[in-house]
Amino acid sequence: MKQPGFIRLATLALLSTLSFFSHGETILRLAYAENSQPVKDALHFLGQQVEEKTGGDIKVQYFPDGQLGGERELVELTQVGVVDITKVSSGLMESFSPEYGVFSLPYLFATVEEYYRVMDNPQVMEPVYQSTAAQGFIGVGWYDSGARNFYMSKAPIKRIEDLRGKKIRVMQSETAIQTLKLLGASPIAMSQAEVYTSLQQGILDGAENNEFALTIARHGEVARYYTYDMHTRIPDILLMSTLTLEKLTPEQQRIVEAAIKASIEFEKAAWDKEIEKTRLAAVKDFNVEFYEIDKKPFQEAVQPIYDGLKNKPRLYGLYQRIQTAKN
């Protein structure tokens, strides 16, 4: 839960006065908004690895679950070095760098294996990570956040026609909004914090997210029809302030980089197990029903997005590299 505004402002004021160095130790401030358990565990594993491998010369200070604000606020705090490391959705990152918009392309990845090959390919990812360097931060890694699927309050999506006119919450992403329009729905961009009440009050007919939204955000209480169309696999992105990186020694940078890579593998291993637990909990606690569908009509409906990519040279070039890296 977020702190009240005046408490958060006081915390930020205090943080801004604290030195990066304290009694011979380097303090890295790692902040994140509400997350799935595998991502939380991976972030804490990252911190443990850094502290262990530096012999305690670097300590990691955590600000979890939105203590310092939502994801956009955390990016802005990372830009100015108040936060050293944060984790945000690449969907949000689209508003900071167009390159991140490629991960919002619908039905881009057919399998998890394809997805992992692309995300672990430095020729694909390094230009994306470095695209925000002039803004004061860069990407340094990624975490799996699963596939985004539709879930509805009154009836399941079994055919593309079932989406027609439905008010669906999406992230503030141009590509996500265009995707929903092509599928016949009425996309509504709003913060995650507003979704539960909006579903409950009928402002929304449904939303789209991974299975953790059903339990962590308790959306399964008010929208229990979950359909696997897997329209996107939008990764979470680890960001570091360039101010922070400049203060670390080359050896410290190497240790942090190795810890990030280890935490990525840690999170991958945990993801599938936690998803299955979440599915079972959603059925038990909220009577959620899960549906599989034929994705082909959905894929055909969004083809205009791909047809328009050639008019966006940077994005089209990245898309081509992704297609090559899949194999």
UniProtKB/Swiss-Prot annotation:
GO terms for molecular function: carbohydrate binding. It comes from the Bacteria. CDD domains: PBP2_TRAP_SBP_like_3 (cd13671). The keyword Signal applies. This is Uncharacterized protein YiiZ. Coiled coil: none annotated. One of its GO terms (biological process) is transmembrane transport. NCBIfam families: dctP (TIGR00787), TRAP_S1 (NF037995). InterPro entries: DctP_fam, TRAP_DctP, TRAP_DctP_sf. Pfam families: DctP. GO terms for cellular component: outer membrane-bounded periplasmic space.
